[in-house]
Amino acid sequence: MFLKSIFILIVLANSIVFAQKPIDFITLDPGHFHAALVQNKMYENVNPKVNVYAPSGQDLQDHLKRINSYNTRSKNPTEWQEKVYEGNDFFEKMLVESKGATAKNSVLILAGNNLKKTEYILKAAESGLNILADKPMCIDSKGYELLKKAFVTAQKNNVLLYDIMTERSEITTVLQKELTQIPGIFGKLEKGTAENPAISIESVHYFYKYVSGSPLIRPTWFMDVSQQGEGIADVMVHLVDLAQWSAFSNVSLSSKDIKNITAKRWPTPIALSQFSLITGKKQFPDFLKKDLKNDTTINVFANGEINYSLRGIHTKLRALWNYSTPEGGDTHYSVMRGTKANVEIRQGKAEKYIPQLYIKPINISEKELIQGFENLKHKYPGIELIKKNTEWLVEIPSIYRTGHEAHFGEVMDRFLQFQAKNQLPEWEVPNMLLKYFITTKALKLAKTSS
C-alpha cells in the first residue's frame, strides 16, 4: 500500500512537471512585421528562447531589429532571446529540429511571404506542430485545397491550426457584436437585399504607414500579388471573419450556407517614387515587370468587393488599399442592420480617425434603449451612452482601447489557452474553412469577370 501511494505521487508529480513545461515559439521566415508583433509582450509559461529559421536577407534583419526594439524599450521591455538559423534550407532544418515531443510543445509562428505559406502549413501539420498563422492562410483555390488537407492532418495529429484574427480584439467590434445579441436594443438581424445589405463592412489600408513609431519599410514582394495575395484574398479575410463571427456567434458554418457570391477587383497604381518610399528600393524588381502600367508605375490588385448571402443574410464587404494618407491611418467602417436599431462603426475625419460605435434607433424608444444598455454597462464598466442628434454614441474608456499592435498579443493569449486544453472551440475550424472558401472563390469569380 505504501509503495502504491509512492508510485501515485511520482506519477502526479511527473504530470504536473509535464503540464508546466514551457511552450517553445518557433518563427519561420518572418517577412511580415506581424511576426514580431506577437512578441510585443511576454507570456506566462512560454520559453523566452525563440528559434528562428529563415533565409538570409533584409526580412530577417528587420524582424530581429523589431524584437530588439521590444527588448530595449524603456516601458515594459521584453526578454526574448532569438536563436537564428540562416540558410536556404531553413524550412527543412526547422522540421528536423522540431520533431516528436518538441513539436507537440511548440507553436510555429508564420507571418511572411504567402506564396509558399500554405505548403509550409501542411508540412508543419504533418510534422505534428501547433501552428499560429497570420492571415491569409491561402491566397488562391489551389492553396485552399492544400489548406483543407492541413486541417485534416492537424486533427489526425492532434495539433492546433489557427489564424490570427486581430479584429476580434478591437473593442468597437466586440461591443458591436454584443449589442446585436441584445434583442431589446437590436431586435433581429435584417435579411437585407443585394442593393441594401444587412451587413456592410469596409476597410481602408495604406501601403506607406507607421508601425511601432517608425515608417514601415515593406519587402518588395509585398507589392506582388502572386506572393502577397490580392486584396480580395488577403485583408478581405478579416472582413469575412467579422461578418460570420458577429452574425452567427459560436455557430458552425459551411459552404452550403453561402449563396449568390459575386465579386470584383481593381488595382491601385503605385509610382516608382512611391514604391521607393514603401520599400527603400530604387527600381522595380524583375518579378514586378508583369504588373507595369507604364515605365514608372505598377498596378497592384489590392482592392476587392464581395457580395453574398450567408444563411439568407445579405452581406457586402470591401477591402481597399491606397498609397498613403495625410492624416490618420487604416480605417474601418461596419454596419449591422437590425429590426429595432442599426449598430455602426465609423472611423472617419469626424471621429478623428478613432473607431467609434453608434446606435441608430429605428423602432425603439429612448427608455428601452437605456434600459437594454444597462447589462452591457455591468459587463464593460465605464461605457456610456451619449445622444448625438438622432443617434447614440457608445463612449468607450481608453482602458479598452488597447490598439492594433496589442491585439496580436491578445490573439496569442487566446491561442495559448486553446493549446493548454489542446482544443479549439468546435465552430472555429469549419468557419476558418468557410472563410477561405469565400475569399478564394470570390477571387476566381472576380478574375473571370474582369
Name these PLM-found stretches:
Residues 3-14:
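Sec-dependent N-terminal signal peptides
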Residues 128, 134-137:
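Short helix/strand-capping hinge loops at secondary-structure junctions
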Residues 138-215:
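A contiguous active-site-proximal alpha/beta segment in oxidoreductase catalytic domains
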Residues 213-316, 320-328:
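Rossmann-like dinucleotide-binding domain that binds NAD(P)(H)
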Residues 20-127, 142-161, 417-420:
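N-terminal glycine-/serine-/threonine-rich beta1-alpha1-beta2 phosphate-ribose binding loop
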Residues 15-19:
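Sec/Tat signal peptide C-region and signal peptidase I cleavage site
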Residues 234, 239, 244, 251, ...:
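C-terminal helical cap and adjacent loop that interface with cofactors, partners, or active-site loops
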